[in-house]
Amino acid sequence: MARQFSLENTRNIGIMAHIDAGKTTTTERILFYTGRVHKIGEVHEAQPRWTGWSKSKSAGSRSRRRRQRHNGKATASTS
């Protein structure tokens, strides 16, 4: 099966930090400000938009991965 997106613009990033250091919050903001999600979920309200969070946390795992496609254009916050 042929790829449906170009690898030329693909970037891999990793976020590593201590427990409760803000990894999910950082990921939420990256997805929001790059336009991948249109609403920010709040971790302290157990409503993060990033899939896999609740399953991972309940299983005691703090390691997650998710593939996202992005056009490389970030939006700036005006607030």
From Swiss-Prot:
- InterPro entries, sorted: P-loop_NTPase, T_Tr_GTP-bd_dom
Entries under SUPFAM superfamilies matching the protein: P-loop containing nucleoside triphosphate hydrolases (SSF52540)
**Record keywords:** Cytoplasm, Elongation factor, GTP-binding, Nucleotide-binding, Protein biosynthesis
Q: GO terms for molecular function, please?
A: GTP binding; GTPase activity; translation elongation factor activity
Q: Which compartments does it reside in?
A: Cytoplasm
Residues binding GTP, per UniProt: A17, H18, I19, D20, A21, G22, K23, T24
A Pfam family annotated for this chain is GTP_EFTU
Q: Where is this region: Disordered?
A: 45-79
Q: Family assignment? A: Belongs to the GTP-binding elongation factor family. EF-G/EF-2 subfamily.
Q: What does this protein do?
A: Catalyzes the GTP-dependent ribosomal translocation step during translation elongation. During this step, the ribosome changes from the pre-translocational (PRE) to the post-translocational (POST) state as the newly formed A-site-bound peptidyl-tRNA and P-site-bound deacylated tRNA move to the P and E sites, respectively. Catalyzes the coordinated movement of the two tRNA molecules, the mRNA and conformational changes in the ribosome.
Q: What is this protein called?
A: Elongation factor G
Q: What is the lineage of its organism?
A: Bacteria, Bacillati, Bacillota, Bacilli, Bacillales
Q: Which gene encodes it?
A: fusA
